[in-house]
């Protein structure tokens, strides 16, 4: 390879990495120190809590934290580099940030043969089933309005980043009803964040 081509590829890689680093900082709210809104604990921005996904950002699109997004990026890039067949899905998306990030990674790498599936009730969390899952006893997460994000709001979040396109597919409903019927042929990456 000639030096000019290598230099051009290095520059492209730097731009790709800077774009994805910026997306990660924006999607977590770290870039603008988005305060927390959880009904427990302090609502001040705490970089340690945000890094580890231990708070509920007030406006950021994901609450999974910087470390989990970095892991999701590494896994998605591995799927691309290793030519793993299949699509990507997250089950339980809140505001859609992790899915937006997966779509951004596909975009940054010019991948057009994979879809990002966005699966959620888009109504919040279901009430706990203590008969089937005794650990649900006392859980009141289904009562928190902060966790109920509509399908239209999630679509708007994709749209705001210029990433709402035909490669983004939505699966609406409670997982026990919606996922068995979802028209997904094959998955390369599955991120489970459902309750």
Please tell me what each predicted stretch does.
Residues 3-19, 24-66, 77, 82-195:
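S-adenosylmethionine/decaboxylated-SAM
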Residues 67-72:
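N-terminal pre-P-loop "Q-motif" helix
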């Amino acid at each position: 390879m000639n030096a000019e081509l290598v230099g051009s590829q290095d520059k492209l890689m730097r731009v790709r990495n800077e774009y994805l680093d910026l997306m990660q900082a924006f999607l977590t709210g770290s870039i603008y120190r988005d305060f927390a809104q959880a009904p427990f604990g302090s609502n001040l921005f705490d970089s340690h809590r945000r890094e580890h996904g231990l708070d509920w950002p007030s406006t950021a699109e994901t609450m999974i934290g910087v470390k989990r997004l970095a892991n999701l990026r590494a896994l998605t890039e591995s799927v691309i580099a290793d030519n793993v067949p299949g699509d990507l899905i997250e089950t339980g998306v809140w505001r859609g940030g992790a899915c937006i990030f997966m779509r951004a990674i596909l975009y940054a790498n010019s991948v057009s043969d994979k879809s990002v599936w966005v699966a959620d009730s888009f109504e919040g969390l279901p009430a706990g089933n203590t008969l089937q899952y005794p650990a649900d006893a006392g859980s009141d997460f289904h009562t928190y309005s902060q966790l109920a994000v509509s399908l239209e709001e999630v679509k708007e979040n994709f749209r705001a980043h210029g990433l709402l396109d035909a490669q983004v597919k939505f699966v609406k409903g409670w997982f026990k009803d919606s996922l068995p019927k979802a028209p997904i042929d094959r998955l390369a990456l599955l991120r489970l964040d459902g309750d």
